[in-house]
Each structure stands twice: as C-alpha cells, then as structure tokens.
Amino acid sequence: WFFFFILGRVIFLLVYSNLLPDVSFWEIMKVFPHAFKLDLSTACWLSAPFLVFISLQYAISWKGWNVIKKVLMLAMLLITSMILFGEIGVYDEWRVKLSHKALLYLRNPKEIIDTVDTGLLVILLIGFAVYVAAFQCLYCKVVIKPAVVPQRYSALKSPIMFIVLAFLIFCGMRGGLKGVPISQSQSFFSQHAILNDAAVNTQWNFIFNYVHFKTLDNSNPFQEMSTEQANDILKDIYATPQDTTIQVLNNSR
C-alpha cells in the first residue's frame, strides 16, 4: 500500500507540475515524509480485513481463502484507484482535495465529463485500468501466498499473533495512542496549498470527509437546542420586570 500511495502522489505531482514553478525540488521532496503518518493510517485501515482472513487461514486449511483475498484486494484497488484518479481529474478545476461532493456529481455524469479535458479523461481512464491491473498482478505474484496447511499447529500461536497485530494495526489507524486521533493537519508543512494537498492521503481524506458528512445527516452541526427553546431563552434575556424608562414629558402617550 505504501508503494501504491507513493506512486499515486508522484503521478499527481507530475500532472500538476505546472502549478509548481517557484517551488524548489527539495521542498517538493518534503511531501513524502510528511505524508507518512496518514499513509500508515490508511494502510492499516485497508489491511485490517486481510488480518482477519490470514488468521482464519492459519487456523482453518481451505484453498478458498486466497480467492477471497484476491477478490477483496481487487475491490479495494478499484475503489482507491478511482478516488486517486478522480482527484487528479478534477484538481485543476477545484484546486482542493476530492471530497464527498464528488458523489453528488455522479447523478449527472455529463457535468464530470464537461469539467475534465477530453484528452486528460482518456489518459486517466487508461491510467486507472493500468494502475489497478498492475497492483492486482503485483499482489497475486508477490504478496499472496499459497494456502497454508498448518503443521504442528499451536492453538495459542494464532490468537496471540492476531491480538498483537490487531493492536499494532489499531495504533496505526488512529496515529498512535495519543488522546487525539490523527488528522489531515498532520501532513501540512508548506505555504503552497498544492504541496499540502499532495501530502494528505487522498483515500483517507475522501473517506473521512464522506463519513463526517454522513454523520451530520444534512443537519446544522451548531444547533445545540430546538428553535422554540432558543426563543424562550431570548425572551427571558430581553424581558424587563418593570419599565425603567425615565419619563421626560408629562404626557405618557
């Protein structure tokens, strides 16, 4: 996953190198170390389901585990690559990270097509297909292993390993054991917005933005009480127990 994120970041910077005319090479290189924490968090989130399947694979010998992991990896690659190339496509127009608002445009795909240059759109579609195919092939050839047949299996080994790895993945997800979880600000380091955008993990940002938006449920996040209750409080604040106006005229009308 780290290679996936780094390569995607390189592609993004190359596509929008025209927006970096006055930025030094060394400042651009700072993007990668500042991106590490969010990349680690995202990698842990994406790796969590595989930890479950690998643990089950060690406990139960079944050839179907590898098929499940291949399908799961393909689904993840499709989603994460779509987010990556979607951001590359709209960044020139939006100049901000891809957010949940992109899903609203899916209701009218013509707006998306009109926003992105035709040549760039074709390149992005080809790049998307090649990206997914390359990383799926890499996973199948290098990462995934043949079905494990436990020999001299210890009933204690798998649970302990699972607990240790689960704890490490949990720590990676939230960016450590500090009171405050990791956020986008962890990657900000430059006065150039595009470098900060490049450092923030695209997939982490999109998913966090989408989940945060769904929790709001189109409601006002600053509304702490009902309108009726607020009006009653205002009436009490402005109410006067007696008229304290100084009478200057004899006529009280």
Q: Predicted regions span which residues?
A:
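Transmembrane and membrane-interface helices of multi-pass
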Residues: 1-216
